Amino acid sequence: MEIVIRTGSGDVRGSKENGIAVFRGIPYAEPPVGAHRFTAPRPPRPWDGVRDATEFSATAPRPPYPEAIGALLIERFIPGDDYLTLNVWTPDPNAVGLPVMVWIHGGAFTNGSGSEPVYDGAAFARDGVVFVSFNYRLGIIGFADLPDAPSNRGLLDQIAALEWVRDNIARFGGDPGNVTVFGESAGAMSVCTLMATPRARGLFRRAILQSGAGNMAVAAEDATTIAAVIAHRLGVEPTAAALAHVPVAQLLDVQQQVAQEIQGAPDPAVWGERIAGGSVLLPFAPVIDGELLSQRPAEAIAGGAGHDVDLLFGTTTDEYRLFLAPTGLLPFITGDYVTTHLAKSGLDADAAKAYTAEGRGEEPGDILASIITDQVFRIPALRIAESRVDAPARTFGYEFAWRTPQLDGILGACHAVELPFVFRTLDRAASLVGTNPPEELAETVHNAWVRFATSGDPGWPAWNPETRSVMRFDHPVSEMVTDPYPATRALWDGVPL
């Protein structure tokens, strides 16, 4: 059954699927091609007639994941240039005032799309939510800092998508005044950034941070260095005008080289002392440009930004195992390597013993995975919560602790494992969660997200600095836990991240 809805740019034709109206590939901006590859997003040109919106649009240009991780996180690749589009699932386009949830995908700001199978919005629509997902520019195209182009183009795309939601979602049954924006990993970092920037103020009422916070931002001088190296390797000037003519495949090749070098052991002769010293973890990420961002998002939120936004935040128990276990690196990590990493991170060598004492690792590889889980994910998220103690809006915390049996159980409750539970798409994620994951847990997690989007209350007490209580999601029992892993949490007090 076909359904036609009039948007601000023209009519779109969706389809009825199991009682839910679904619209795919609706443009929220013009395709970023040719001279417009690096410009700010431009409103879509109005069209005559009815535009077909029954199939997903192209996905943003991106490289494949490394093989070991790509076997677990299945991506959908759809070729084409018209990828600044969004998708809508609605229970009833004729309804009035339904809650809206807008999903921002993760992928280190270099991978992912709004059309991945695990992000199907049908379960949210079945539960009375108008669900929206979208694509945004990634990698060099979205985040390389160039003097003749706006910075943070990927973020500008996200804001444009939210503005489309504000202007159009009522036509799909949604309430533009009750929007929850949520994301995972780089998507959660994006949400935190949107909370921090005045440009996005008023576009959403609630936010969910899944495994990402506000500490990932690239300093302007580092962004300039990265752009210069990219251009040098491509044999062009470090400008948008020059890079606009470079074939996408070449951009992606250099993008992968740059990411591997910066995340490995960057040569100071190439990258300078700052980047060689670890100033950049994600080379393609929000840039502190003095316009969209004047400081790191975490600092802006500590100063009061986003304090009127209800917040649900959390992490998985074993985040970083996704990046160490599938590659086979865990058994080869030595105690000396852990000690060196602790020293670089500002912690004493004895910190490793605290991780073992709290049951977070016996072998060096397991200890390192827990340390980096805290360093990159858990502690930054807790610092966001701590900075909102006096906020008028409420803050709620969770920990996702269910351990996947995949790879003989060595992944644990790794990064991204909660996604098919949130979306109730367990059948789309067997590579990550196995063939018999607990559907009851998916129902519990998903329903909490729906409750939060509907009312601002996920169903458990708000986070506070006295008890630090969070909901620990696991099977067969999900329960409130007071101050998880307090000793290793305290190790990071006062340590810059």
UniProtKB/Swiss-Prot annotation:
Gene3D superfamilies in the record: alpha/beta hydrolase
Predominant cellular place of this UniProt entry's protein: secreted
Catalytic reactions of this protein: a carboxylic ester + H2O = an alcohol + a carboxylate + H(+)
Leading EC class: hydrolase
Pfam families given in the database record: COesterase
Keywords attached to this entry: Hydrolase, Secreted, Serine esterase
GO terms for cellular component: extracellular region
Sequence similarity: Belongs to the type-B carboxylesterase/lipase family.
Name this polypeptide is given: Carboxylesterase
Taxonomy of the source species: Bacteria, Bacillati, Actinomycetota, Actinomycetes, Streptosporangiales
